[in-house]
Design a protein with these regions (language model features):
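C-terminal substrate-recognition "lid" of short-chain dehydrogenase/reductases
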Residues: 2, 125, 177, 215-242, ...
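Conserved glycine-rich cofactor-binding loop
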Residues: 14-15
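Short C-terminal tail/terminal secondary-structure segment
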Residues: 94, 99, 150, 236-253
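Substrate-binding pocket helix/loop in short-chain dehydrogenase/reductase
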Residues: 98-114, 196, 207
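Active-site helix of classical SDR
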Residues: 125, 161, 169
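Alpha-helical segment proximal to the catalytic Tyr-Lys
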Residues: 130, 173-178
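Residue(s) in the substrate-gating loop at a strand-loop-helix junction
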Residues: 145
């Protein structure tokens, strides 16, 4: 799909990865609406990058746990931007709880992670289905995690939410075909992000050593994979892993 003059909605556009995705889509010719919660300064910085690229930017405050807020955001982007061709479900929430410490993962925390990371993307995809299908080929790209492919992320709740998002990708690819293609990007450790900076040095260095390329991904790498999937006309229901080639996540068929 040619991306010039397409309208993209990126959730969590105020963060490191979301901001990079917005920048890459703007560079590819898209007008970009982005959602944020709390981080107004980050959202405004991203919007400035989009407008500096000569594209329109639109900010939307969104609570991904609230169905009314989700429906309002969907209506907002269509009204303000004249439609929506691309949805990037990037926004997520996490809390670091080691897997064995089940007693620390209470029901409220579990619900917050799953509602933000899985329920929210489903509801927003559903709300924008007609708008995405109205053009010459809509696109949804879900940003998951390698933690959704195998245990090892910062909490069981996060890992399960991202596994669900990967399978939601498969399900929506069937449900929304042929008008909308639905794909997924699963990052590993992403250099330079706030989440990566919170990791112990030994953990980050271990990830770099294990990667067969000798390095892990950056926010720009995640953005590039997202743009690739937006452009692709015959890819749907797929997950691209961006982690430098971690042996445990590789499948050579």
């Amino acid at each position: 799909m040619e991306l010039t003059d397409k309208v993209a909605l990126v959730t969590g556009g105020s963060g490191d990865i979301g901001g990079a995705i917005c920048e890459a889509l703007a560079a590819a010719g898209c007008d970009v609406a982005l959602t944020y919660v709390g981080n107004t300064a980050g959202a405004e910085r991203t919007a400035a990058v989009v407008t500096a690229a000569g594209r329109r930017a639109h900010l939307i405050a969104l609570d991904q746990r609230d169905e009314g807020s989700i429906d309002a955001a969907a209506a907002d982007v269509v009204a303000a931007m004249g439609g929506c061709d691309i949805l990037v479900n990037n926004a997520a929430w996490n809390i670091g709880i080691p897997f064995p410490q089940l007693e620390l993962l209470d029901g409220a925390t579990w619900d917050r992670v799953l509602e933000t990371n899985l329920r929210g993307p489903f509801l927003l995809s559903r709300a924008l289905r007609d708008a995405l299908a109205a053009g010459d080929g809509g696109r949804i790209v879900n940003i998951a995690s390698v933690g959704g492919l195998s245990p090892g992320s910062s909490s069981i709740a996060y890992s399960c939410s991202k596994a669900g998002l990967i399978h939601l990708t498969h399900c929506l690819a069937v449900a929304m075909a042929p008008a909308v293609s639905v794909n997924c990007v699963a990052p590993g450790l992403v250099e330079g992000t706030r989440m990566a900076q919170r990791l112990p040095d030994a953990v980050a260095e271990g990830a770099r050593r294990q990667a067969v390329l000798g390095k892990v991904g950056s926010a720009t790498d995640i953005a590039d994979a997202t743009v690739l999937l937006c452009r692709a006309d015959t890819i749907t229901g797929q997950t691209i892993v961006v982690d430098g080639g971690m042996p445990g996540a590789m499948n050579f068929g």
